[in-house]
Curated annotation (Swiss-Prot):
(6S)-5,6,7,8-tetrahydrofolate binds at S110, L111, L112, P113. Its EC number is 2.1.2.9. HAMAP family: Formyl_trans. This is Methionyl-tRNA formyltransferase. It comes from Campylobacter lari (strain RM2100 / D67 / ATCC BAA-1060). It comes from the Bacteria. InterPro entries: Fmt (IPR005794), Formyl_trans_C (IPR005793), Formyl_transf_N (IPR002376), Formyl_transf_N_sf (IPR036477), Formyl_transferase-like_C_sf (IPR011034), GART_AS (IPR001555), Met-tRNA-FMT_C (IPR044135), Met-tRNA-FMT_N (IPR041711). It is an enzyme of class 2 (transferase). It catalyses: L-methionyl-tRNA(fMet) + (6R)-10-formyltetrahydrofolate = N-formyl-L-methionyl-tRNA(fMet) + (6S)-5,6,7,8-tetrahydrofolate + H(+). Pfam families: Formyl_trans_C, Formyl_trans_N. GO terms for cellular component: cytosol.
């Protein structure tokens, strides 16, 4: 039985942690982010992985260090003598002192060297990639730059971030087990630095849209679901849309067709079907109800 130290924070990591336990690995310790204030009442809430360990009364020691460079933390890890350190969306950089203790295997939600960084799923969707996947990587000091151990790919076309997140969680869980069981036989493959694409952390303002390009708006809608969503300068949000045409050029913002519960809206390039929307500070409405309330009709401008 292999001894594992697991480092991870969100539900993506919990899926992997659960699989490790189910497959009989000895998870000695969980390293995760500190409890964070959540919601209007700012209630101090544990990470998803910590919550999983506590709710299931698992005999796994939990660490929430502010820094992994703390000598006491490094010594704690050395004392445990892990066979592997498995890292999945932990949120902290591992210093060389920890990388040298045992093989550190990172689960990354892209087919590296594409999308190194904090938003690989959203970036793949934004760029309209039809295929993406997850990989296991032997960690080094650089950001997502280590040698690839194994990878698995799948079709993400037309799927939003929430859907891909669930798919990748399951793929990553299975891939983790495969990599650990076959580690001695796997030949690590260096990443091709000429193919590197970096991706940044998503901010709320990334969801801002204008009616220029229907295809780009639709990819943003998929990539930024459920957060930050897509919205206009005036605060209006499009909550459910479809891409109808990506090429036709015309005046933007015109209601081209009114349907039972939706309407077609022109962009400078392309056409969108608007199904559900929400004005700033108002309740969510289906598109037809919104038009009726505003007394908007075929040929009118939405704004």
């Amino acid at each position: 039985m292999k001894n594992i130290i697991f480092m991870g924070t969100p539900s993506y990591a919990t899926c992997i942690l659960k699989e490790l336990i189910d497959k009989g690995f000895n998870v000695q310790a969980l390293f995760t982010q500190s409890d964070k204030p959540v919601g209007r009442k700012q209630i101090l809430t544990p990470s998803d992985t910590k919550k999983f360990v506590l709710e299931n009364n698992l005999n796994i020691e939990i660490f929430t260090p502010k820094s992994l460079k703390d000598e006491n933390i490094i010594n704690e890890i050395k004392i445990l003598k892990p066979d592997f350190i498995v890292v999945a969306a932990y949120g902290k950089i591992l210093p060389k002192e920890i990388l040298d203790i045992a093989p550190c295997i990172n689960l990354h939600a892209s087919l590296l060297p594409k999308y190194r960084g904090a938003s690989p799923i959203q970036s793949a969707i934004l760029n309209g990639d039809k295929i993406s996947g997850v990989c296991t990587m032997l960690m080094e000091e650089g950001l997502d730059s280590g040698a690839i151990l194994e990878s698995t790919e799948c079709d993400i076309e037309g799927k939003n971030s929430a859907e891909v997140f669930i798919m990748f969680s399951n793929l990553a869980a299975k891939l983790t087990i495969s990599t650990l069981l076959n580690f001695e036989k796997i030949i690590p493959k260096k990443q091709d630095e000429s193919l590197v694409i970096h991706c940044k952390k998503i901010k709320k303002e990334d969801g801002l849209i204008t009616l220029d390009n229907a295809s780009e708006i639709y990819q943003k809608f998929l990539a930024f679901y459920p957060w930050p969503g897509i919205f206009f300068e005036n605060g209006m949000k499009f909550l459910d849309i479809e891409l109808i045409d990506s090429e036709k050029t015309q005046k933007s913002g015109v209601i081209l067709q009114v349907e039972k519960e939706s309407f077609l809206l022109s962009c400078k390039k392309g056409i969108l079907k608007i199904k559900t929307l929400q004005e700033s500070g108002k309740k969510v409405l289906d598109a037809k109800t919104y038009l009726n309330g505003k007394r908007l009709k075929l040929g009118d401008s939405l704004f």
